[in-house]
Swiss-Prot record:
Residue positions binding D-arabinonate: 210, 260, 281, 337
Keywords assigned: Magnesium, Metal-binding
Protein name as catalogued: D-galactonate dehydratase family member Pjdr2_1176
InterPro entries: DgoD-like, Enolase-like_C_sf, Enolase-like_N, Enolase_C-like, Mandel_Rmase/mucon_lact_enz_CS, Mandelate_racemase_C, Mandelate_racemase_N_dom
PROSITE patterns for this protein: MR_MLE_1
Keyword Cytoplasm carried by entry: no
Length: 407
């Protein structure tokens, strides 16, 4: 069996926002790739890998994935944090990649084999107003999508208003548009009414609330959009208030997809066991990789909850590959969010996931089936890149009085 000889973090994309983990072994040419990307704290994740996890694993048998996962999980003593789980997730994916290459099989075959011929996916349609949104939805339908996420005016979906139209106090904080919950509660049902009038019931829609509402208003929104038969409403309530999903479930039949910010098993376990959600939406890398997510999927299957692993603009092709291999093998798969990578980004990742119409197709090569051209990865960084000057905090929204809106 292959022994781990080194673990390297390869930064790529503009400003180094992607971190690809490369686990090397003592077998000639045998290595694995994983995703440990964190657009807001990339260097912190790299430090965890290089200073804590890599020294733990060098010399260990790469085949013992579960034992290595538990070793990484417990060796920092404090656990269940986003940065640690991202670091673990990147290494875990790489170990599964190695195992697939050793076996000569795609990872989904190691997870039990194919449950489906391809992976249904959804894209992101948006616009500053309903006219632009309808135009974008038409484009996605023409591309073959049957499920589409719809946002109007950003994550606020019509809830952002110009400052000159808002009642702003003196010495107001911030300078951009402000988020108004009542405007949002009016705009979103109206948006879906117009979309259904335009497109009928032949296409399914999702919408991302991004935890911008108070729990009571989230329940109101879920009730108001019921007539429009959403595929799901995403992250209606912030993780700090997940107990409110009990009240939401009692009052609305709108399907709920939850978990983009989840990293701790205690955040999803009760929601799944009490059947308060319909889709679990953790990010594969943030939850601890393939090993963690196959356990989440098994728990979810027992309680009738489906998977909808989170992707999004800051995710990389390796994370998407890991998600799709899970999707192929999980019976209770629901839908997969798709990433729209630039041509030059795809060019750096040979074997990236292919999309045809509304379906994703994994590589049939051994492992995750994806390879990184390190020269092209370096070129994606751009000129003058320096990890020491990187600073990219999440851009927060505010209400009219200056109160921060929780993302």
């Amino acid at each position: 069996m292959a022994k781990i000889t080194g673990i390297e973090c390869i930064r790529t994309r503009k400003n180094g926002t992607w971190t690809i983990v490369k686990v090397m072994t003592d077998q000639d040419g045998l290595y694995g790739l994983g995703s440990a990307s964190d657009v807001y704290n990339p260097e912190a994740v790299v430090q965890i890998i290089e200073q804590l996890l890599a020294p733990l694993l060098i010399g260990k048998d790469a085949a013992n994935i579960e034992d290595l996962w538990q070793t990484m999980y417990m060796s920092g003593y404090w656990r269940n944090g986003a940065l640690l789980h991202t670091a673990i997730g990147g290494i875990d994916m790489a170990l599964w990649d190695i195992k697939g290459k050793e076996a000569g099989l795609p990872v989904y075959q190691l997870l039990g084999g194919a449950c489906r011929a391809a992976v249904p996916c959804y894209g992101h349609a948006g616009g500053k107003d309903i006219a632009e949104l309808k135009e974008d939805v038409h484009r996605f339908i023409e591309e073959g999508y049957t499920v589409i996420r719809v946002q109007m005016g950003g994550y606020g979906g019509g809830g952002f208003i110009d400052r000159d139209k808002a009642n702003i106090p003196q010495q107001a904080w911030g300078s951009g548009p402000v988020f108004d919950e009542q405007s949002y509660l009016h705009a979103i049902p109206h948006m879906f009414e117009q979309l259904r009038n335009e497109f009928g019931m032949g296409v399914q829609f999702t919408h991302d609330v991004h935890e911008h509402l108070t729990p009571v208003n989230a329940i109101q929104l879920a009730k108001r959009v019921e007539p429009y038969s959403l595929f799901f409403l995403e992250d209606a309530i912030a993780p700090e208030q997940i107990g409110w999903y009990r009240h939401l479930r009692q009052q609305s039949a709108t399907p709920q997809a939850v978990g983009e910010l989840f990293v701790n098993p205690q955040e999803w376990t009760q929601l799944i066991k009490e059947q308060l959600i319909d889709f679990i939406r953790v990010r594969v890398s943030k939850a601890g990789g393939i090993s963690a997510c196959r356990k989440i999927a098994a728990l979810a299957e027992a309680f009738g909850v489906r998977t909808a692993w989170q992707e999004g603009g800051e995710n990389d092709p390796v994370n998407q590959a890991a998600a799709v291999h899970l999707d192929m093998a999980i019976w209770n798969f629901g839908i997969q969010e798709v990433n729209h990578f630039k041509p030059e980004e795809k060019d750096a990742f040979e074997g990236h996931i292919e999309r045809k119409g509304g379906y994703l197709y994994p590589s049939q090569k051994p492992g995750l089936g994806i390879e990184l051209d390190e020269l092209k990865a370096q070129q994606l960084l751009g000129e003058g890149w320096s990890k020491s000057v990187y600073f990219n905090p999440y851009q927060l929204d505010r209400k009219a009085d200056g109160t921060l809106v929780r993302p």
